[in-house]
Amino acid sequence: MRNYSLNPTEENAYKLLRENPIQRNEYVFQFVRLLTHMEDNCYSVALNGDWGSGKTFFVKQVKLILDAHNPQFHMKDETRREIQTLYKADEKPNSYATVYYDAWTYDNHDDPILSLVYAASQSGQKADLSDSPSHVLEAAAAVFDAFTGKNLTS
């Protein structure tokens, strides 16, 4: 029996965003607009759907749009322009540093904080650390302290 499922890779999410075969882009764009109009508070968002209903693709497509509008994100200029053209809104989204964290991938790790930090480090954000590498280390140590209760900063 042939499998017709599509793996939720970044390339496939981009292709579905470009081609819009199931007419879902409007929902993706509405969600990006919702994020853009949220106040500066903390929010939790739950996406509920059956297995295989497209939650992962939805999140990855939202991430692509946000990344395309973030000048600090590594992305080919042509891809960035095409995604920005697809997302036609009165306002461009805020510039967010996005991190895709797949909890199932890291399910067997003992310390979820380390896997989260790893996922963030692989996120594709540009960073100029040449001016203040010690500040970066201090910030990383403070995050470690906060999550572990250990005291690296003293």
Region annotations inferred by a language model:
Residues 16-28, 53-59, 108-116:
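Phosphate/oxyanion-binding active-site loops and adjacent basic polyanion-contact surfaces
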Residues 1-45, 65-94:
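A short, basic N-terminal segment
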Residues 8, 49-51, 103-105:
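Short, flexible loop/turn elements at secondary-structure junctions
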Residues 59, 64-154:
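P-loop NTPase nucleotide-binding core
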Residues 41-61:
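Walker A/P-loop nucleotide-binding motif
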